Amino acid sequence: MSIDRTSPLKPVSTVQPRETTDAPVTNSRAAKTTASTSTSVTLSDAQAKLMQPGSSDINLERVEALKLAIRNGELKMDTGKIADALINEAQQDLQSN
């Protein structure tokens, strides 16, 4: 395969102008009028705690330690342990269904 053997470029065909009408076109969505309604939402205590700043279910120190271990090539993965956990989780899912 040679880079020099490429097919010649073909010019793009001209764009045909379309006919426009002088009458204004109304958008059906804009023309509709809707009454505004409000919805009230009440959060559970658990949800309210999750929404508070500073409450995190992620251990950021552990995440940084894992990032550092990966970066340094020091992270050891126990594939057998991971496989066992996946199988156990799949079995639990099958039993609950």
Swiss-Prot record:
<feature type="region of interest" description="Disordered">
    <location>
        <begin position="1"/>
        <end position="39"/>
    </location>
</feature>
<keyword id="KW-0805">Transcription regulation</keyword>
<dbReference type="InterPro" id="IPR031316">
    <property type="entry name" value="FlgM_C"/>
</dbReference>
<comment type="similarity">
    <text>Belongs to the FlgM family.</text>
</comment>
<dbReference type="Pfam" id="PF04316">
    <property type="entry name" value="FlgM"/>
</dbReference>
<dbReference type="GO" id="GO:0044781">
    <property type="term" value="P:bacterial-type flagellum organization"/>
</dbReference>
<protein>
    <recommendedName>
        <fullName>Negative regulator of flagellin synthesis</fullName>
    </recommendedName>
</protein>
<keyword id="KW-1005">Bacterial flagellum biogenesis</keyword>
<dbReference type="InterPro" id="IPR007412">
    <property type="entry name" value="FlgM"/>
</dbReference>
<keyword id="KW-0678">Repressor</keyword>
<feature type="compositionally biased region" description="Low complexity">
    <location>
        <begin position="26"/>
        <end position="39"/>
    </location>
</feature>
<comment type="function">
    <text>Responsible for the coupling of flagellin expression to flagellar assembly by preventing expression of the flagellin genes when a component of the middle class of proteins is defective. It negatively regulates flagellar genes by inhibiting the activity of FliA by directly binding to FliA.</text>
</comment>
<dbReference type="InterPro" id="IPR035890">
    <property type="entry name" value="Anti-sigma-28_factor_FlgM_sf"/>
</dbReference>
<keyword id="KW-0804">Transcription</keyword>
<dbReference type="GO" id="GO:0016989">
    <property type="term" value="F:sigma factor antagonist activity"/>
</dbReference>
<dbReference type="GO" id="GO:0045861">
    <property type="term" value="P:negative regulation of proteolysis"/>
</dbReference>
